[in-house]
A protein has these predicted regions:
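Conserved PLP-enzyme active-site core in the AAT-like
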Residues: 256-259
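Solvent-exposed, non-transmembrane regions of membrane-associated and secreted proteins
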Residues: 1-251, 261-269
């Protein structure tokens, strides 16, 4: 797992460099009104407006849409990466791929089709999913440490959008109504499997766009209660968190034990001589 984590960090950094080069190139071309980047933004905005107007009628099961509604390669964007998600409290930075298929989810976070695309704006809710962990790579592994008021940052092809956690729920996989757009709001919603390794529920973190005069407190949690605010957050670790800690540190403990056994064998061998 430690090797996988290190290799993934290198891969993510390389992917990020390539993405930034693509953004730089597209932004240079965007000075022309009919540039691919301007066209992409216009098309994405129109898509967001349409699904809101249609009340996301096509959204039955957000996990069943493996293909994206957009092919970014048509606009000059490689690998179907629309941006990055940064969560300081979880210490993660992941690429956001369009299309929730297994290949994309093995590499980073994914945008759930039939939800708002990650460009912000009123009447939007971009749902972003990721594994709790994949082959030792953390991803949304530590999502349960998230608290009301925590910052979530989205860097797309055009700008950086900042959000704050406003609500947390544990839902059933079929509860698609729990990830619908909320009228008048600009939101990003993080979702992952729960509990860790069992995966029969979904852990959902709702985030609302930052406002200069907004105070991020006194928020409540509905459905199955997880936390209400920073002061009320329970200190006891959940079953998932215990499992995560075990998976994270058991290889290290194993190495230490093997080292101690080796030392004992060496010392015992010398005494016999």
């Amino acid at each position: 797992p430690l090797v996988n984590k290190y290799e993934n960090k290198i891969e993510v950094n390389e992917t990020k460099k390539n993405f930034e080069k693509t953004v730089e190139k597209l932004q240079e071309e965007s000075k022309e009104e009919d540039s691919p980047l301007n066209k992409l933004y216009s098309d994405m905005k129109a898509y967001n407006e349409k699904i809101y107007k249609d009340k996301q009628s096509d959204l039955k099961d957000p996990w069943s849409y493996e293909q994206s509604s957009f092919d970014l390669t048509k606009y000059g964007v490689e690998n179907n990466i629309i941006g990055y998600i940064i969560v300081p409290h979880m210490e993660i930075e992941l690429p956001i791929y369009l299309g929730a298929n297994s290949d994309n989810m093995a590499k980073g976070a994914v945008h759930m089709s039939q939800t708002s695309l990650p460009i912000g704006g009123e009447n939007t809710n971009c749902v972003i999913a990721a594994h709790r962990g994949y082959k030792g790579i953390p991803m949304f592994c530590d999502i349960e440490i998230m608290e009301i008021g925590d910052e979530v940052i989205i860097k797309n092809l055009w700008e950086t959008l900042k959000y704050r956690v406003s609500n947390i729920k544990i839902i059933n996989p079929s509860d698609s109504q729990e990830v619908l757009i909320q009228s008048g709001k600009d939101m990003v919603t993080l979702i992952t499997c729960h509990p860790y390794t069992k995966n029969y529920k979904r852990y959902v973190v709702y985030c609302e766009r930052e406002k200069d005069d907004e105070e991020n407190n006194n928020q409540t949690v509905s459905n199955e209660t997880v936390t209400a605010n920073k002061e009320d957050k329970p200190k006891k670790l959940s079953e998932s968190q215990y499992r995560i800690l075990f998976d994270r540190y058991s290889p290290l403990v194993g190495v230490v034990i093997m080292g101690l056994l080796l030392i004992v064998l060496i010392v015992t061998g010398k005494k016999k001589k």
